[in-house]
Amino acid sequence: MAIRLEDKKAIVAEVNETAANALSLVVADARGVTVGAMDTLRKQARESGVRLQVVRNTLAKRAIEGTDFECVKDALVGPSIFGFSMEDPGAAARLFKDFAKEQSKFEIKALSVGGKLLEAGQIDALAKLPTLEQALGQLASVMIAPVTKLVRTFNEVPTKVTRVVAAVRDQKQDAA
């Protein structure tokens, strides 16, 4: 089915806008994956802030020109599904990695973060990135740890004095 030129321009503009606002991109080949499984993937993508798009490669190549994801052009061979992470850089990688475990025919082709092309085998590195909430929690615990240690140190001095006084008292009672 032929697509009109105006429609092609609209598709390119939409994908370009998505790519310009995305934090990371994962490209996969979904040949052989059932429609039901793809519907499940789309539902999970919506829940995790990932934008899925299936676009012809020629249109996709034009759409990602001038964006951080221009480096994935060479991976655009055959049918491709694009997963753009809009809020969390590792969201699309986690989603595609988990889906690939369930669907043996789902193959990850390439991924990109910050203009760098990563091989499909490096998806674990991107998938293991903490979410924003996890990163903030880790930062808070690192910042609170020295203060907590200082408070414990201050509390330790009176505790030691109390133990010494109790030991002297017990010693005097035993001597009496």
UniProtKB/Swiss-Prot annotation:
Disulfide bonds: none annotated. GO terms for cellular component: large ribosomal subunit. Gene3D superfamilies: 3.30.70.1730, 6.10.250.290. Keywords: Ribonucleoprotein, Ribosomal protein, RNA-binding, rRNA-binding. The keyword Iron-sulfur does not apply. It holds the Pfam family Ribosomal_L10. One of its GO terms (molecular function) is large ribosomal subunit rRNA binding. It comes from the Bacteria. SUPFAM superfamilies: Ribosomal protein L10-like (SSF160369). One of its GO terms (biological process) is translation. The keyword RNA-binding applies. Signal peptide: none annotated. Part of the ribosomal stalk of the 50S ribosomal subunit. The N-terminus interacts with L11 and the large rRNA to form the base of the stalk. The C-terminus forms an elongated spine to which L12 dimers bind in a sequential fashion forming a multimeric L10(L12)X complex. Belongs to the universal ribosomal protein uL10 family. Forms part of the ribosomal stalk, playing a central role in the interaction of the ribosome with GTP-bound translation factors. This is Large ribosomal subunit protein uL10. It comes from Saccharophagus degradans (strain 2-40 / ATCC 43961 / DSM 17024). The gene is rplJ.
